Amino acid sequence: MLDESPMRKGNSVSNDQGNPESNASVSIHQQNQIITCASPGPVCPNAIGIKRDIVVVRLRPVKSCPDYRFFRRVFETLEKWQLQVDMFSTSLGRITLALGAAALQAGIGDSCSARNDMMSRDLMHGMQKLLPDDHILELFPHMAIISVVGHPSRRIAGHIFATMDANDILTVMISHDAARLGIACVISEQHTAKALGVFEQCLFRYSLTH
């Protein structure tokens, strides 16, 4: 999913912080910022990837439209406009899609800049044309996907989300693959640098002692 993204390898970080299991949490001073890490235990991901220029589209049908019909129309729309979906989730009849801004701009047309004018009225009208009529639409622009790839572990998901919560990094979407080898989160694009630093320090550096 993130094959075009820059990757940070775990073996590129040296360990000089000692045993992480001695405390429930650890604070790291990095570039005049304090990063709080929950104790990871035996967690050692292989890499972190990030993909920017993501738009999150949240859709829900009107009451008169059955869920199965609404879902079919959404997928037909994606196929018609050949929109690549980076992440997808459903909940109580709602559909949330993470789409590349460039793909949206191509589908809507060159008259609207998906990167710089994402919340404009022109873009909203363009999205309304792409999608079925029987829906309520919300857009969340300027997002990014951060993906952690590693070994299967029942603890890695909890540690990732505890670390993000401790550092005030909010998530909009979460995806965990069936093999438990990777976790992807959609966050605000303005928090990508912070998230990379947090994950590198808390997941890589402290796991090298195990």
Curated annotation (Swiss-Prot):
Keywords: Alkaloid metabolism. GO terms for cellular component: cytosol. Pathway: Alkaloid biosynthesis. Residues 11-26 have a biased composition (Polar residues). One of its GO terms (biological process) is homoserine biosynthetic process. Loline alkaloids show broad-spectrum anti-insect activity, and different lolines may have different biological activities. In vitro tests of NFL, NAL, NML, and semisynthetic loline derivatives with long carbon-chain acylations on the 1-amine have shown that many are effective against both fall armyworm larvae and European corn borer larvae, but the effects seem to differ depending on the modifications. N-Formylloline reduces the weight gain of fall armyworms by deterring feeding, and does not significantly affect corn borers. SUPFAM superfamilies: ACT-like. GO terms for molecular function: aspartate kinase activity. The keyword Oxidoreductase does not apply. It comes from the Eukaryota. CDD domains: ACT_AK-like_2. Residues 1-26 are annotated as: Disordered. Induction: Expression is induced in loline alkaloid-producing cultures as well as in planta. Aspartokinase-like protein; part of the gene cluster that mediates the biosynthesis of loline alkaloids, potent insecticidal agents composed of a pyrrolizidine ring system and an uncommon ether bridge linking carbons 2 and 7. Lolines are structurally differentiated by the various modifications of the L-amino group and include norloline, loline, N-methylloline, N-acetylloline, N-acetylnorloline, and N-formylloline. Belongs to the aspartokinase family. This is Aspartate kinase-like protein lolA2. It comes from Epichloe uncinata (Endophyte fungus). The gene is lolA2.
